[in-house]
Amino acid sequence: MTKTRILLSDSTDPWFNLAVEDTIFRSMPADQRVLFLWRNADTVVIGRAQNPWRECKTDRMEQDKVKLARRQTGGGAVFHDLGNTNFTFMAGKPEYDKEVSTKIVLAGLQKLGIHGVANGRNDLVLEDEQGIRKFSGSAYRETLDRGFHHGTLLLSADLNRLADYLNPDLKKLQAKGITSVKSRVINLNTVKADIEHQQVCEAIMQAYCEHYQQQVEPELISPQSFFDLPGFEQKFAQQSSWDWNFGQTPPFTHHMDERFSWGGVEVYLEVERGTIVQATIFSDMLDPYPMEQLALRLSGLTYNKTALEPCLAQLMQELPQYQLPLEEFQRWFIDQID
């Protein structure tokens, strides 16, 4: 008989939860099925092939201590807070079936008086006076012998904060990654005012056990106990690293231009794996030497202000006669990177 497990995370760290998900998925026997329920504190979660500089307001996230987490699956960028409940269904093949897991989630919600439906894409929706409204999005991953379906449920998320960290000015980024599809969304507390995370988890667990006709005791997952699982520590280190969350970004070009009192500049930065591989600066500045020097020095630097500010400071120190235009350029340039 297939062993059935239910895991509940008591951590709200997105890097921990995503590392748990991936470690369990990789290490579970192919004849096992797992339900994993979790939630994250303030986080922007991006798809595996997305560009965080395009999808997110990274400066605002840093200011507000909002984490960035790149998941293993595709799809778009989403904002998580404690008003979200996340689910992951894992199973070996041929049992793995995302339609079954979707039915289980909907059955759990029906126990709470919420009658959602699956639409033609990968969303769960409700219909109200404003039309069809999305309350859940999903993404999927499959290997040769197993698969998983994970998604998020909007219970009481602060929807106003979506605009704080997503949908930035595009700043002429020409990206090869996937741009998120923005959908109209709704919180489930508009249907059931007292809905909360534990209540939803219990309803989904009950629907899960009923579907498989098994009674399963949930296992509590916490950072204090989980680091002993083989491979987890390395996966957590990867999941929380800058190289994974930013460096895995598909190649892109950042084009920016501005006119200053001393002349105009047009900057092209070719970025791969979070590193500037080529910088080109055009300018009608009377003496273009400082811009030529800057272009040479930008190549090879990490694409963030922490790496770029010292480069400009060093150039100003070496070329004091150009300090005023370089200072003006620096203020504008660093703001564009953010």
From Swiss-Prot:
Disulfide bonds: none annotated. GO terms for cellular component: cytoplasm; cytosol. Signal peptide: none annotated. Its EC number is 6.3.1.20. Gene3D superfamilies: Bira Bifunctional Protein, Domain 2, CO dehydrogenase flavoprotein, C-terminal domain. PANTHER family: LIPOATE-PROTEIN LIGASE (PTHR12561), LIPOYLTRANSFERASE 1, MITOCHONDRIAL (PTHR12561:SF3). In the transfer reaction, the free carboxyl group of lipoic acid is attached via an amide linkage to the epsilon-amino group of a specific lysine residue of lipoyl domains of lipoate-dependent enzymes. Monomer. This is Lipoate-protein ligase A.
